[in-house]
């Protein structure tokens, strides 16, 4: 039994899918996210691709904006999903993702938490196993038709304020870690071969 004031609705009533899609032709470099490059909201790599010198994958079509949820439609149990915070203007993701945009921005975090809970992943994985395809997969209608237990708007708003701060901090921490890792990888070989010492002024390297 659900609490008083709560409702059970289909997830698709609160969001739209794949709102922004490119024709695949770009006149500027892009940052491409493939399904294998994000796991449980952690991006391993964004591929920098320049159409003047690189082959742009045919699946590089989905455009994303702040707060969009990307959810791989292949093998949901592998957890290739995340919520996009502070995306670059030229970020493009694979058509292997369902890109989910909440109709009301406050819902994005609530919907994301619902989609990544164990019961939902298990449910979608079961659906994927029965798919008539070469590999376990789902489609957007499978996500749209999920039953979502929704609290009152006032509770959603309160939750969203806290969740937004947390996800922004997670994004900031991730970018700082990537920057520090890059600096380490650049400086360690120089330290090992004697080009710099632990007492050197490393500020020039930090600015790279």
Regions found by a protein language model. Give the residues of each.
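Non-catalytic DNA-recognition/assembly elements of restriction-modification systems
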Residues: 1-22, 149, 153-157, 164-199
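Proline-centric
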Residues: 2-3, 98-108, 136, 140-169
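Sequence-specific dsDNA recognition surfaces
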Residues: 12-24, 33-68, 78, 93
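A short beta-sheet element
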Residues: 60-62, 66-121, 127-140
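Feature representing long, continuous alpha-helical segments
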Residues: 79, 109, 113, 122, ...
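Amphipathic heptad-repeat alpha-helical coiled-coil/stalk segments that mediate oligomerization
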Residues: 197-208
């Amino acid at each position: 039994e659900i609490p008083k004031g709560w409702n059970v609705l289909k997830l698709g009533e609160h969001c739209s899918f794949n709102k922004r899609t490119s024709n695949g032709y770009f006149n500027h470099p892009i940052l491409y996210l493939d399904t294998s490059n994000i796991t449980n909201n952690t991006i391993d790599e964004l591929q920098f691709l320049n159409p003047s010198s690189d082959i742009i994958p045919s699946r590089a079509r989905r455009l994303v904006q702040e707060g969009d949820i990307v959810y791989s439609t292949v093998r949901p149990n592998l957890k290739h999903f995340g919520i996009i915070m502070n995306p670059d203007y030229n970020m493009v993701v694979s058509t292997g993702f369902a890109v989910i945009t909440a109709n009301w921005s406050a819902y994005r975090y609530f919907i994301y938490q619902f989609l990544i809970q164990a019961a939902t992943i298990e449910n979608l994985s079961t659906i994927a196993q029965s798919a008539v395809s070469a590999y376990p997969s789902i489609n957007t209608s499978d996500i749209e038709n999920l039953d979502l237990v929704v609290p009152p708007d006032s509770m959603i708003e309160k939750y969203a304020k806290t969740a937004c701060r947390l996800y922004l901090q997670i994004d900031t921490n991730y970018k700082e870690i990537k920057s520090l890792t890059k600096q380490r990888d650049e400086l360690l070989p120089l330290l090992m071969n004697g080009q710099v010492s632990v007492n050197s002024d490393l500020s020039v390297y930090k600015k790279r």
